[in-house]
Swiss-Prot record:
The gene is menD. Its cofactor is Mg(2+); Mn(2+); thiamine diphosphate. This is 2-succinyl-5-enolpyruvyl-6-hydroxy-3-cyclohexene-1-carboxylate synthase. Transmembrane segments: none annotated. NCBIfam families: menD. Catalyzes the thiamine diphosphate-dependent decarboxylation of 2-oxoglutarate and the subsequent addition of the resulting succinic semialdehyde-thiamine pyrophosphate anion to isochorismate to yield 2-succinyl-5-enolpyruvyl-6-hydroxy-3-cyclohexene-1-carboxylate (SEPHCHC). It holds the Pfam family TPP_enzyme_N. It is an enzyme of class 2 (transferase). Belongs to the TPP enzyme family. MenD subfamily.
Length: 569
């Protein structure tokens, strides 16, 4: 290949890569500007089957892709240039790996002769993500390498993949073709019918990893008193079928904030607080069997209950082989979808309805929350409950880490309608939460609310640039308690240490940040103002910011007060 055709061959390889990704189910491509990734960028720009999303910051870009992949339930491509641009994706890649979300990183790179020799913007990119991504290292485009070798490498790496893949793409200059005069007809002729179809070059059948118990095993398992626990489940996993299973067995269904069922009227959603209550805890202690769907439970009290209880039978259902049990309990792990496992011919338990009193206890807590939160002083828990009540089956709720997700888990109301719920609880970081929520909002354009703390929002402030591109209702509710006030709940030995080294009060407001990016903004410090601002924002076709100003100790003091009431109830 003559040197003046290098740019055209680079672009051809980029085109083959992006075309095959679209055939492998990729619907979205997220791109940051950069020169070394030009062959990929130009190919993506002309690829009509991929929806393009652009952002200048690769860290936010990676998290936006994560949100898109969560909601589309399909792999999302990310294009970056070389150097630290790629490294900025690392937090999002870690979160994706831990939560089994497929991302495909396409990183532009210098050719081998420019690595480790002082060349500009060149780092060692292969294996940059260590164990957190499957690694594919492509050679520089070469006419001697048949195009089907490139396609089959992509097909094997991405088909049936639920984890991140890093495809490192080395390109020699020139990168910008002035013309497309090179004739690659003969080079592409070995692809045969691929050029006239819409299918991947190699097609892999779906891998079935279902392992299901026998009818005899089911009968033995349901003998006695048991509970069902719904951990982290996606909306696509049809978790509602667990309500039917609970009713069929006559066992209570205890739900985590991330189960999609936390607000459902047919479940025991207040389990975190019920485990504070002596009567409820004593009743739950009678359970002999437990059936856990998913993992990554939020409530420490529920995790401790699972760990401390002497189970006769402990089953956990996961979509594939992995360890999701920090207590390391002895158990039978089944690999199955939620729907396949729950829809078996389950017999009714010999001790059906053994824990009906839990419904009373659960409803009693809801009454207590109405008194102690909804009709008390304005604060974070009141806002969380109000937002939860305002959702419906068509809306999406992204809940930020630290205090917001814990308030939702502890106090979310029982409602006839409830949203699709999303979190980033793999590594549980406070980075990239706004960007991930933007990705969630962008896929289908459903009304989306983000509940986020002030420190988390400061951490991801420049992702307001992504938010401004959203054309559907997208409400960013910032709970501003002036610092990391979740540390008020932790046993830091000295109040000055807590203030100086953990809480980090900043005294900042977000009005100028919203104005910088041209976003509608309201700052509220009472419920009437919040409710009015939220109703206006959720009806607006675009992004809005609502800053909720609350005192530093309001939430922690209220949590302690409610815990006292619960223990006495």
């Amino acid at each position: 290949m003559q040197i003046d055709k290098t740019a055209e061959l680079n672009l051809l390889w980029g085109t083959l890569i992006l075309e095959e990704l679209s055939r492998l189910g990729v619907q979205h491509v997220c791109m940051a500007p950069g020169s070394r990734s030009t062959p990929l960028t130009l190919a993506a720009a002309k690829q009509s089957k991929l929806k393009q999303h652009l952002h200048f910051d690769e860290r936010g870009l990676g998290f936006m892709a994560l949100g898109l992949a969560k909601t589309s339930h399909a792999p999302v491509a990310i294009i970056t240039t070389s150097g630290t641009a790629v490294a900025n994706l690392y937090p999002a890649i870690i979160e994706a790996w831990l939560t089994q979300v497929p991302l495909v990183v396409l990183s532009g790179d210098r050719p081998p002769e420019l690595i480790d020799c002082g060349a500009n913007q060149a780092i060692i990119q292969p294996a940059l993500f260590a164990q957190y991504a499957k690694q594919i290292n492509l050679p520089t485009p070469d006419i001697a390498i048949r195009p089907e070798a490139l396609l089959t490498m992509l097909d094997e790496a991405i088909s049936n993949q639920s984890l991140p893949v890093h495809i490192n793409c080395m390109f020699r200059e020139p990168l910008y073709p002035s013309t497309m005069s090179a004739d690659f007809t003969q080079y592409l002729s070995t692809l045969g019918n691929w050029q006239h179809t819409t299918s991947p070059f190699n097609q892999y059948g779906k891998t079935s990893q279902h392992s299901l118990p026998t009818q005899d095993s089911l009968a033995r398992f349901v003998h006695g008193k048991g509970v069902i626990i719904a951990g982290t489940l996606s909306p696509q996993e049809s978790p509602e079928i667990l309500v039917e299973l609970s009713q069929k067995l006559g066992w209570p269904l205890l739900t985590d904030a991330q189960s999609q069922l936390r607000q459902h009227s047919g479940v025991i959603g207040n389990v975190d607080q019920l485990l504070h209550q002596p009567k409820a805890r004593a009743l739950l202690a009678q359970a002999e069997s437990v059936l856990v769907f998913g993992g990554r439970l939020l409530s420490k009290r529920l995790i401790n209950f699972l760990s401390e209880q002497k189970w006769k039978r402990y089953w956990q259902v996961l979509p594939q082989q992995m360890r999701l049990d920090p207590s390391h309990s002895a158990k039978q792990v089944w690999h199955s979808s939620v729907a396949a496992f729950a829809s078996q011919a389950w017999p009714r338990s010999s001790d059906a309805n053994w824990a009906l009193q839990l419904i009373q206890f659960n409803d009693g807590l809801e009454t207590l929350f109405q008194q102690q939160i909804d009709n008390a002083e304005f604060g974070e828990a009141m806002v969380v409950r109000a937002i939860a009540k305002a959702q419906n089956r068509q809306s999406q709720l992204f809940i930020g880490n630290s205090l917001p997700v814990r308030l939702y888990d502890m106090y979310a109301p029982i409602t006839p309608d409830y949203p699709r719920t999303y979190t980033n609880r793999g590594a549980s970081g406070i980075d990239g939460l706004l960007a991930t929520a933007c990705g969630v909002a962008k896929h289908e354009g459903k009304a989306t609310t983000l509940l986020i703390g002030d420190i988390s929002q400061l951490h991801d402030l420049n992702s307001l640039a992504i938010a401004r591109t959203i054309e559907s209702p997208f409400v960013i509710v910032i709970l501003n308690n002036d610092g990391g006030n979740i540390f008020n709940l932790l046993p830091v030995p000295d109040e000055k240490l807590r203030s100086d080294y953990y809480r980090l009060a900043h005294g900042l407001e977000f009005g100028y940040g919203a104005a910088m990016f041209g976003l509608a903004y309201n700052r509220v410090d009472d419920f009437e103002s919040f409710n009015e601002a939220y109703q206006e924002a959720i009806a607006f076709q675009g992004p809005s910011v609502i800053e909720v100003s609350v005192a530093q100790h309001q939430a922690s003091e209220q949590i302690a007060s409610i815990a006292t009431w619960v223990k006495q109830s």
